[in-house]
Amino acid sequence: MYFRPCEVCGGVGSELHHIIRRSHCRALIHCELNLIALCPKCHRSSKGVHGKHGHELDHKLKLDFQNKLEMLFDKEYLTEEIINDVLKISDSALKGLLKPLKREKEGYERISVIRQIMGGRLYEWKY
């Protein structure tokens, strides 16, 4: 338990939640950007991100994270250094993240890197 307020409702007794699940992108296990403080209600209740009816909140958190990545990665092509300056992950985690991607002469294509970070998919607003 952490002493940060819940980033969704402001509640107390927060727990750290991986926005992109570890099974979807192991490279982000220790990435601070991928962690969010949630109170037990927003984390584990039926309407929390892990709850039966929590899909909407989970989708919103993922979309917010993706939008943050789109702002932080503001160039069309990204080098390993630029990616690691943002993610701050280990060299081996970075290597594992980028292994499936094709490196162009200029670097890795921005949208491919973001898709890889997001667990292999991009999220859109639900109306």
Predicted regions mapped to residue ranges:
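Generic structural signal of hydrophobic/aromatic residues within well-ordered alpha-helices
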Residues: 65-69, 94-97, 114, 118
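Short Lys/Arg-enriched helix C-cap and helix-to-coil transition segments
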Residues: 99-127
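Polybasic, low-complexity binding patches
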Residues: 23-34, 44-85
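Alpha-helix initiation/capping motif
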Residues: 21, 31, 79-80, 89-90, ...
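Short cysteine-rich loop/turn motifs with clustered Cys
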Residues: 1-15, 39-41
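Short recognition patches in nucleic-acid-associated and regulatory proteins
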Residues: 13-27
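Repeat-unit-sized solenoid/scaffold elements
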Residues: 73-91, 112-123
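Short, basic interhelical loop/turn and adjoining N-cap
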Residues: 54, 85-99
